[in-house]
């Protein structure tokens, strides 16, 4: 059976049935859509919109009409740019943009002041998008598998950040700004080009540090409460006086419900391991979160 394809301006035939559930959500994942049907933007009460793995190439400016939208999944598509209208969604808390072709984010992206969880892994970002620095409420930032070489000195402005995933980038030195991110719980620098680390004791809230697949000869100096993943980690943790902490999940799983803050740092398989979706990601179960 082939993937259903809708005409550009019409809602799929089953959309009305979905909306009648009263949950104000629309699942379009896995369909063949080059652009979002214009009728979707007329659903002014919509709160959850899933458009993953559809081949989507563009979004209309009219997406800003979805003023009640809280969750927007656009991952595994072919988006090269985002419209300014997407930046005018005042209630948006979760945005999934992984696996697209994005080189940058719009300057107005900083208007998304309700955003708490952003996945933008698997794109073509060479520089850290500066609009993100103004998202002080953002708690979970997934930027793995991009092309970053450095982080801005102003990164500590993101005082709400608790989980930062930077695996699969091109860092050759540990970014100095990270040493001033004292509220981070999870830091993932797998698969970079790091040859060493500074003393990481300044990261007092750190609970998980992953540095696997880097050209380092041993683990960094960290507090005994930090779970390490990488060369020499098992030996280092075995030397501790206290029992080795139970490892919290390192990679965030997809979660589409409006959980509390602690559930934004949930664990499980990252989206890069899932491949293009054939349907909804909502079937994935959320693991227990890491509290603040």
Swiss-Prot record:
Tell me yes or no: is Repeat among this UniProt entry's keywords.
yes
Q: By its UniProt entry, which SMART domains does this protein fall under?
A: LRR_BAC, LRR_TYP
Record-linked SUPFAM superfamilies:
L domain-like (SSF52058)
| Pfam families according to UniProt | LRR_8
Q: Which residues cross the membrane?
A: none
* Keywords from the named record: Leucine-rich repeat, Repeat
Q: Which InterPro entries match?
A: Leu-rich_rpt, Leu-rich_rpt_typical-subtyp, LRR_dom_sf, LRR_domain-containing
The domain of life is Eukaryota
Tell whether Ubl conjugation is among the UniProt keywords.
Answer: no
Q: Where is this region: Disordered?
A: 1-20, 236-261
Which spans does this entry mark as compositional bias, Acidic residues? Answer: 7-16
The LRR repeats extend over 22-43, 45-66, 68-90, 91-112, 114-136, 137-158, 160-181, 183-204, 205-226
**Name of the featured protein:** Leucine-rich repeat-containing protein 10B
Q: What is the lineage of its organism?
A: Eukaryota, Metazoa, Chordata, Craniata, Vertebrata
